Amino acid sequence: MKEKTVITNISIVNEGQIVVSDLLIEKGRISKIGSIGQRNDCKQIDGTGKFLFPGIIDGQVHFREPGLTHKGDLHSESKAAVAGGVTSFIDMPNTVPNVLTIDILNEKYRLASEKSLANYGFFLGVNGDNLDEVIKLDTGRLLGVSDDGLYFTKKGNLLADNPETMEKLFANCKSVIAIHSEKEQLVEENEKRYREQYGEEVPVEFHPLIRSEKACYESTKRAIEIANKYGARLHILHLTTEAETHLFRNDIPLIEKNITTEVSVHHLWFSDADYKRLCTLIKWNPAIKTEKDRQGLLKALLDDRIDLVTTDHAPHTLEEKQRPYFQSMSGAPIVQHSLSIMLEFFKRGLISLEKIAEKMCHNPAILYRIEKRGFIREGYFADLCIVDLNSAWTVSKENILSKCGWSPLEGTTFQSKVTHTFVNGHLVYDNGQFNETVKGVALIN
């Protein structure tokens, strides 16, 4: 097998511009961008008419290993990821056991080194039970700490609901603090009101009223106020409301921001009008909200109040999703389709290719200080994906790669397709075929 690859005559989407050029990959890195032409010592890929992106860095996934592997695992979900152009991911701490110690964190890195086709990183979990231990760590060496998913323990340890805990963490933590931001007191009050009216048969259409705009806004506003008090690096996960977007700045570059946020692709794609058709299949926390919110999120993404696009990929079995509203699990698989969704917005004239690369590739690398990735530059790791903007395909059970085997996007036709994905210079995905002999590497040393 030839260790070098040359991609010729491809439109490179990178750092605010699109340039047609050749690109040479050798020893896992981008060694040259410029005129290269045909070379007998290289694998050749003709990029004519196609577009080359930096590999997507997904800053929020739930790949379910260890402990929840009937839903997904590091191999199955990373396979779905690379098929969608995702070359790196950061996994959340709500696996079993929760990632509340360095030993458990290191075990996840070990598992990923054996199983993941993509590069990998993991948040250290933080809640009221392990706060003192987290503060003692050199958190500057972590990708980040997060409470996401840990509120499902029902111990009252959701960070956003504990201002004293936030004060202590924000005053002492040097790394990114990524939080799930909803005011649980308001959520519980809303739930009680609808239970009194409907009992256990509350329709899923009320999910965005139970997990309401007010619950999100008040929580996010308070977290930002406390973070600003200490100069903490606060990142609000999966923003869902237009109101919240006005709490974030766009007058300084990302590298200078301490307060940042993201939007997950499903909150850009779906609105509350879709609950009637898809029911609990699109039950996420925070909830998918109104069309006004959806459009407001897209506007904030375009004007840089929102910094990242992520997936919050969270597979559950179909049986777990199709239960009645209160029993149905929140979350769904979507990592395979995130770039396709954003490219569909491009085809509709709603976003540029350059902005997609900024929000899905460049900015995650900047925010999480991931070295030599997220950009197409000579000397950087060759994490890349090739896209055909004129190759329509339809999501079906036959082409869904997530272990759970279903998607709320089934039946959706996308106009663009990922054709090739490189991870550290290795062609791991090639038009439906996978090279599973090579594995990704850790995003931190």
Residues covered by each model-derived region:
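N-terminal metal-binding scaffold of metallo-dependent hydrolase/deaminase domains
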Residues: 1-39
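Metal-associated gating/positioning segment near the N- to mid-region
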Residues: 48-115
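Histidine/acidic residue-rich metal-binding segments in metalloenzymes
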Residues: 132-309
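C-terminal cap of metal-dependent C-N hydrolases
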Residues: 10, 324, 378-444
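His/Asp/Glu-enriched, well-ordered alpha-helical/loop segment
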Residues: 201-222, 226-231, 281, 302-309, ...
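Divalent metal-coordination and catalytic microenvironments
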Residues: 10, 28, 49, 60, ...
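A glycine-rich helix N-cap at a beta->alpha junction
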Residues: 110-126
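Active-site metal-binding motif and surrounding structural segment of the metallo-beta-lactamase
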Residues: 37-52
